[in-house]
């Protein structure tokens, strides 16, 4: 257990560093390009290689590769398997690169048909010719990360993504004044090279860097089939991003950037709280008999964290966007639309967070069918309602958070209804979380009437969180009391040990 905890801690630390530098990367793009035709074009062109990066990073490749690799190690076929899978990845990535280089205009037209008559289209076509070259780099990153994880190397693979962001930021800052918008495309490639350097060094050091072998024998065919099947579930979330890009291309210039900037912020509490909770829950319910108790606790804890996060994003949307992005070429109009989107996206945070917990219940029972169906249902609903809101009701860019709210709540109901054993809904706790969050929102509103400085208001977030937590204790909410008891008890123990 200590080794598991240490490995999880190291991996989480690497991911946290990557998140921090990821936001610095976005802020740098916003500084130089704001929400413009150039930024829209870049986010469109980077969508394809970035989708593969996220699929690989979220475990789509690891989920298949690691069991096969582990079996090959046991049978002393490690080198042969590594050579064949390396060859497969090279073939796959280079095939996609060739298609991207031969048909860039057609690909951009399919992804974002609404920009064909706009200046954005020519920029996107130019960018794609560069960004598609990132795919072999990210494929090698996924391959090397999977090998190193099996070898017990956790921190370096997780921190490699940070090096991508760091390389991207430095390249953009250094090259912008010389190359202009082309600095964005080159920053992706330089960041990709930064990303694979530490993994390559470790593979070479451990003598695990093999010469690729191009083979399509029975083992590789089985591996490929399982990978493509697994890819379906992991790619559904990325398909949702393509749907958003497709629909946003029909709106005013800058809309794709508005959606991107806002989504990056509202997804943060979901990834920090619910994903980490769901991973922990999966480990617990897979080994313990008292699964219902752990699931109930996870649901309460998810609500306890996601509801105030939702309130905070709603009340502080303008201030948060201002602190993160409002500088350089990020205009007042960009701030208006991005913060407006964020305030609406905030309502979806609890629904998406709870989805992760319920999906974990299915995974613990080895049921991948329902979570996969729910992911594609989510894409369908977002596409349906997004189209209705944009083309029939003319809601413009605000169509996306409204469609996300309907989709996320509907999918949550679907996941709950399909549970073989219903988990109890903690209505009593829910009411307390809503009351405490409302009073926290009142405190935010009060401080906003005293100062309009966004940096001061955002710096008060820990105070708002503490106020919410204390209010829960006043309401006698059991989880808050247990947490406070644990903190107080640990403090007493440490005090006795120091004496």
Swiss-Prot record:
It holds the Pfam family MurJ. InterPro entries: Lipid_II_flippase_MurJ/MviN, MurJ. GO terms for biological process: cell wall organization; lipid translocation; lipid-linked peptidoglycan transport; peptidoglycan biosynthetic process; regulation of cell shape. It is found in: Cell inner membrane. GO terms for molecular function: lipid-linked peptidoglycan transporter activity. Its main location: membrane. Pathway: Cell wall biogenesis; peptidoglycan biosynthesis. The chain crosses the membrane at residues 4-24, 26-46, 88-108, 130-150, 154-174, 184-204, 227-247, 265-285, 297-317, 335-355, 375-395, 396-416, 425-445, 455-475. Coiled coil: none annotated. One of its GO terms (cellular component) is plasma membrane. The keyword Flavoprotein does not apply. Keywords: Cell inner membrane, Cell membrane, Cell shape, Cell wall biogenesis/degradation, Membrane, Peptidoglycan synthesis, Transmembrane, Transmembrane helix, Transport. It comes from the Bacteria. It is a multi-pass membrane protein. Belongs to the MurJ/MviN family. Involved in peptidoglycan biosynthesis. Transports lipid-linked peptidoglycan precursors from the inner to the outer leaflet of the cytoplasmic membrane. PANTHER family: LIPID II FLIPPASE MURJ (PTHR47019:SF1). This is Probable lipid II flippase MurJ. It comes from Aquifex aeolicus (strain VF5).
């Amino acid at each position: 257990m200590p080794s598991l905890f240490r490995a999880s801690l190291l991996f989480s630390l690497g991911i946290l560093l990557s998140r921090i530098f990821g936001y610095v990367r976005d802020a740098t793009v916003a500084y130089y390009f704001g929400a413009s035709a150039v930024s829209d074009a870049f986010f469109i062109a980077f969508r394809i290689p970035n989708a593969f990066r996220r699929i690989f990073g979220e475990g789509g490749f690891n989920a298949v590769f690691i069991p096969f690799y582990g079996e090959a190690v046991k049978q002393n076929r490690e080198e042969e398997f590594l050579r064949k899978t390396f060859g497969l990845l090279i073939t796959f990535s280079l095939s996609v690169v060739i298609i991207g280089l031969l048909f860039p205009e057609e690909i951009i037209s399919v992804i974002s048909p609404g920009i064909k008559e706009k200046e954005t289209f020519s920029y996107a076509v130019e960018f794609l010719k560069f960004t598609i070259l990132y795919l072999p780099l990210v494929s090698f990153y996924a391959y090397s990360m999977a090998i190193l994880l099996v070898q017990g190397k956790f921190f370096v693979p997780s921190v490699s993504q940070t090096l991508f962001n760091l390389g991207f930021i430095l390249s953009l800052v250094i090259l912008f004044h010389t190359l202009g918008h082309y600095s964005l495309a080159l920053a992706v490639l330089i960041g990709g090279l930064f990303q694979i350097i530490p993994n390559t060094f470790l593979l070479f050091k451990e003598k695990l860097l093999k010469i690729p072998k191009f083979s399509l024998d029975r083992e590789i065919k089985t591996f490929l089939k399982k990978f493509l099947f697994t890819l379906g579930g992991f790619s559904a979330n990325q398909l949702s991003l393509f749907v958003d890009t497709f629909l946003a291309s029909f709106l005013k210039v800058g809309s794709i950037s508005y959606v991107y900037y806002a989504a990056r912020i509202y997804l943060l509490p979901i990834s920090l709280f619910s994903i980490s909770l769901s991973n922990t829950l999966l480990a617990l319910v897979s080994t313990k008999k008292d699964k219902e108790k752990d699931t109930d606790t996870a649901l309460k804890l998810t609500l306890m964290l996601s509801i105030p996060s939702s309130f905070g994003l709603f009340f502080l949307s303008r201030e948060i966007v201002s602190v993160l992005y409002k500088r350089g070429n990020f205009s007042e109009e960009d701030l208006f639309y991005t913060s407006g989107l964020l305030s609406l996206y905030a309502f979806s945070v609890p629904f998406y967070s709870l989805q992760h917990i319920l999906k974990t219940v299915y995974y613990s029972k080895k049921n991948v069918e329902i979570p996969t169906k729910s992911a594609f249902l989510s894409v369908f609903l977002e596409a349906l309602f997004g189209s209705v809101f944009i083309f029939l009701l003319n809601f413009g860019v605000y169509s996306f958070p409204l469609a996300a709210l309907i989709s996320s709540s509907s999918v949550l109901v679907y996941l709950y209804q399909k549970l073989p054993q219903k988990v109890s809904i903690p209505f009593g706790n829910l009411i307390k979380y809503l009351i405490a969050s409302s009073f926290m929102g009142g405190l935010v509103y009060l401080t906003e009437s005293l100062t309009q400085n966004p940096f001061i208001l955002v710096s008060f977030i820990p105070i708002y969180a503490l106020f919410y937590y204390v209010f829960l204790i006043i309401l006698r909410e059991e989880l808050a009391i247990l947490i406070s008891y644990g903190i107080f008890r640990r403090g007493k123990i440490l005090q006795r040990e120091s004496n």
